[in-house]
Amino acid sequence: MNKVKFKKGDLVKVIAGKHKGTEGPIIRVLREKSRVVIEGITNIKHVKPSQDNTEGGIQQVPASVHISNVALIDPKNKKEITKISYQIADNGKKVRIARKSKAHLA
């Protein structure tokens, strides 16, 4: 299992798969499955009519993307993607930073 370095609210870009090129913030991180849910990426699901839902129809469900298909967008230069690294701050706490711009991440 990979270590998930992404957090809710990080601005990411999909770099592979069906939704390649899509950008958006992370809504939810599924650590046990190494997946993230990104705003704006949905799967369309056909729902058959049932007693509870007599209409049925098409429903949009949020889709998750594997973390290997996602890259962080650099907070300083919004057009570049970067990796996440860690650094020990002056107060002794471990802080996430963007590797390219050395900017601190929330």
UniProtKB/Swiss-Prot annotation:
It holds the Pfam family KOW. Coiled coil: none annotated. GO terms for molecular function: rRNA binding; structural constituent of ribosome. The keyword Magnesium does not apply. Keywords: Ribonucleoprotein, Ribosomal protein, RNA-binding, rRNA-binding. It comes from the Bacteria. Belongs to the universal ribosomal protein uL24 family. HAMAP family: Ribosomal_uL24_B. One of two assembly initiator proteins, it binds directly to the 5'-end of the 23S rRNA, where it nucleates assembly of the 50S subunit. SUPFAM superfamilies: Translation proteins SH3-like domain (SSF50104). GO terms for cellular component: ribonucleoprotein complex; ribosome. InterPro entries: KOW, Rib_uL2_dom2, Ribosomal_uL24, Ribosomal_uL24_CS, Ribosomal_uL24_KOW, Translation_prot_SH3-like_sf. It comes from Spiroplasma kunkelii. Part of the 50S ribosomal subunit. One of its GO terms (biological process) is translation. This is Large ribosomal subunit protein uL24. The gene is rplX.
